[in-house]
From Swiss-Prot:
Catalytic site: 326 (for atpase activity), 481 (for nuclease activity), 555 (for nuclease activity), 667 (for nuclease activity)
Motif (Walker A motif) on chain: 226-233
Cell location: Host nucleus
The gene coding this protein: TRM3
EC number: 3.1.-.-
UniProt GO cellular component terms: host cell nucleus
Any coiled-coil regions, as ranges: none
Protein name: Tripartite terminase subunit 3
Domain of life: Viruses
Any one GO BP annotation for this protein: chromosome organization
Family from the record: Belongs to the herpesviridae TRM3 protein family.
Motif (Walker B motif): 321-326
Originating species: Epstein-Barr virus (strain B95-8) (HHV-4)
């Protein structure tokens, strides 16, 4: 690695190089290396800014950071100013004034230990000069010069020189710029793509981004789902105009969902080119909706603006970039012609659209969330962690965390949300906020398949048949999720009772379900809940006399004392012998008849989802319920909660699951999930209370 003592010599070379009035960039004008490593040729690496050094420095982030801070300013900047509108890092304005903090004694000692570079090694010196020449050649490459002009023009565009009004890129707009810019680099400079990727990193503030991640911009297709009125078309017009005016031999296509949109973009591009650049170089053909920008001594660049109504208008064309505006609303008959450009080696399709959940036909882009490549980019004002809070609170209009912000030109408040949703329920979440989670309510991304739910509903087991009953286990598993409230709008007590196939424990049958609410808030809540459980078990045992024992888990997360009381009452009153899951007291050796729900809930949900999708979970034809049966089929009541299951990603990469809805809690679902978990895992120990 580099020694600290070498920094003085490097800084001196940089100072001399930066002060030279040379057409070369930065320290590439230096002919003398600062360091000369004379080891084996296979172990050394010629660095154009430093010298010949050990090859291990190729993986040294410190060297990269050193050259970034003390090296020449990026060559694409006309002056020594940074590009804050791109997110670029601040410039080190006065590198020549940086003073090294080495004590004279230490400096003299290090100089004796580390002599000056040995310039007699002609082979190493030749390697260094070759690297300098190669670096200079890249900076003189015509494609590089065009790319530099594009970045400079984009900076001027955003600073207000073209539109007389400064602008700043939103994050998704910067993404569209990067996908367009870096893809053109990859097809126009195949041999030096990685080098140019590295050179332009600092222009966009991507210094910390690895080369592997930069290769994402080389994707053949990218999808952006953006809320309404966020500047989607504006940035596309800017990108197309600047590419035409600065890059030669680039063919661009633009497809809109409506003719008037394509006409407006066509006119705006012409206006930008004629007012900001040499209008004599602009040729317009309104019959074919094409704009050509002439480059002196080079091949011209063109753009074609088309609509999806003429699905054959883009057939036979060659595009390097194809922008599909409001892609969710493109006529499906035109999609084959658009997707055909995926086969073109040097073509990239960029889909940009607002979100619409009205029907599946206009939400097809959201399917790409399951793509192997990370194609989908979604802008939303509600993060996954707070999605449930947003559904439950009508006055909430954005995410309560501070990772997201609302642009100043967007108005969002509770009145707008209420009024918008009066026109069309859910319109505020999807059309205005870019929220795509509601798409899962359709058939776009189901956690549980529709055919599996239909089978659970229709194919119920006749457990009263002696032949079927003979195959069932003699144990009944009951899970109790108690809630100590009489508010029917809040959570209630969920109770589920299941058994399993004697030969296959993974084959589970639902025998009973309860969703119980207290009549009043008195001191006998534990008694009321326990009585409901005993009544359920008694009914099931009457119908299924082959059952011999009951294994119960009473959740104690809400109130441990009440959970123990519920278990004690059940143990005394149950018509069959009862055994309970016990939890050991941390401060003593005592064990309490209650179950503390921890991180097993996510695993239990995944197990149930798999069981429903594989039809290993069934319901009895005589599913018992003393609380649901009066108003609703208990199995359909359960299915309504299963349909609402949705995964919520956590920061550690795992998922949690919920089935809560605005007007319905998921108490019965949670009880069934845990009862199924107890019956299938067979790893919990059940003990009697008395």
């Amino acid at each position: 690695m580099l020694y600290a003592s070498q920094r003085g010599r490097l800084t001196e070379n940089l100072r001399n190089a930066l002060q030279q009035d040379s057409t070369t960039q930065g320290c590439l004008g230096a002919e003398t290396p600062s360091i000369m490593y004379t080891g084996a040729k296979s172990d050394r690496w010629a660095h154009p800014l430093v010298g010949t050094i050990h090859a291990s420095n190729l993986y040294c982030p410190m060297l990269r950071a050193y050259c970034r801070h003390y090296g020449p300013r990026p060559v694409f900047v006309a002056s020594d100013e940074s590009l804050p509108m791109f997110g670029a890092s601040p410039a080190l304005h006065t590198p020549v004034q940086v003073q090294m903090c080495l004590l004279p004694e230490l400096r003299d000692t290090l100089q004796r230990l580390l002599p000056p570079p040995n310039l007699e090694d002609s082979e190493a010196l030749t390697e260094f000069k070759t690297s300098v020449s190669s670096a200079r050649a890249i900076l003189e490459d015509p494609n590089f010069l065009e790319m530099r002009e594009f970045v400079t023009s984009l900076a001027s565009f955003l600073s207000g020189q073209y539109k007389h009004k400064p602008a700043r890129l939103e994050a998704f707009q910067k993404q569209v710029v990067l996908h367009s810019f870096y893809f053109l680099i990859s097809i126009k400079s195949l041999e030096i793509t990685d080098t140019m990727f590295d050179i332009f990193q600092s222009a966009f503030g991507l210094e910390e981004m690895t080369l592997e991640k930069l290769h994402i911009f080389k994707q053949k297709a990218s999808v952006f789902l953006i809320p309404r009125r966020h500047g989607k078309t504006w940035i596309v017009v800017a990108i197309i105009s600047l590419i035409l005016s600065n890059l030669s031999n680039v063919q661009i296509g633009y497809v809109a969902h409506q003719k008037h949109v394509a006409s407006a973009v066509f006119t705006e591009i012409i206006d930008t080119l004629t007012k900001s650049f040499d209008s004599k170089r602009v040729e317009v053909n309104k019959e074919t909706s094409t704009i050509t920008f002439r480059h002196s001594g080079k091949i011209s660049s063109t753009v074609m603006c088309a609509t999806c109504f003429n699905k054959n208008s883009i057939r036979g064309q060659t595009f390097h970039l194809l922008f599909v505006d409001e892609a969710n609303f493109i006529k499906k008959e035109a999609l084959p012609a658009i997707l055909g450009f995926m086969l073109q080696k040097d073509a990239k399709i960029i889909f940009i659209s607002s979100v619409n959940s009205a029907d599946q036909a206009t939400s097809f882009l959201y399917k790409l969330k399951d793509a192997q490549e990370r194609l989908l980019n979604v802008v939303s004002y509600v993060c996954q962690e707070h999605r449930q809070d947003f559904d439950m609170q009508d006055s909430m209009v954005s995410c309560p965390c501070f990772r997201l912000h609302i642009p100043s030109y967007i108005t969002m408040d509770s009145n707008i949300r209420a009024t918008t949703n009066l026109f069309l329920d859910g319109a505020f979440s999807t059309e205005l906020m870019g929220d795509t989670s509601s798409l899962s309510q359709g058939s776009l991304s189901r956690t549980v398949r529709d055919d599996a739910i239909n089978q659970l509903e229709l194919c119920r087991v006749d457990t009263l048949n002696p032949r079927v009953a003979g195959r069932l286990a003699s144990s009944l598993y009951v899970y109790v999720d108690p809630a100590y409230t009489n508010n029917t709008s809040a959570s209630g007590t969920g109770i589920a009772a299941v058994t399993h196939d004697r030969a296959d424990p993974n084959r589970v049958i639902v025998l009973g379900l309860e969703h119980f609410f207290l009549k009043d808030l008195t001191g006998d809540a534990a008694l009321q809940i326990a009585t409901c459980v005993v009544a359920l078990v008694s009914s099931i045992v009457t119908l299924h006399p082959h059952l011999e024992e009951v294994k119960v888990a009473v959740e104690g997360n809400s109130s441990q004392d009440s959970a123990v009381a519920i278990a004690s009452i059940i143990g005394e009153s149950c018509p069959l012998p009862c055994a309970f899951v016990h939890t050991k007291d941390k401060t003593s050796s005592l064990q309490w008849p209650m179950y503390l729900l921890t991180n097993e809930k996510s695993k239990a949900f995944e197990r149930l989802i798999y069981a429903v999708n594989t039809a290993s979970l069934s319901a009895s034809q005589v599913t018992v319920s003393n609380t649901i049966q009066l108003s609703f089929d208990p199995v359909l009541y359960l299915i309504s909660q299963i349909r609402a299951i949705k995964p919520i990603p956590l920061r550690d990469g795992t998922y949690t699951y919920t089935g809560k809805q605005r007007n319905l809690s998921d108490d019965v679902l949670v009880a069934l999930v845990m009862a199924h978990f107890l019956a299938t895992t067979q790893k919990h120990t059940f003990k009697k209370v008395h």
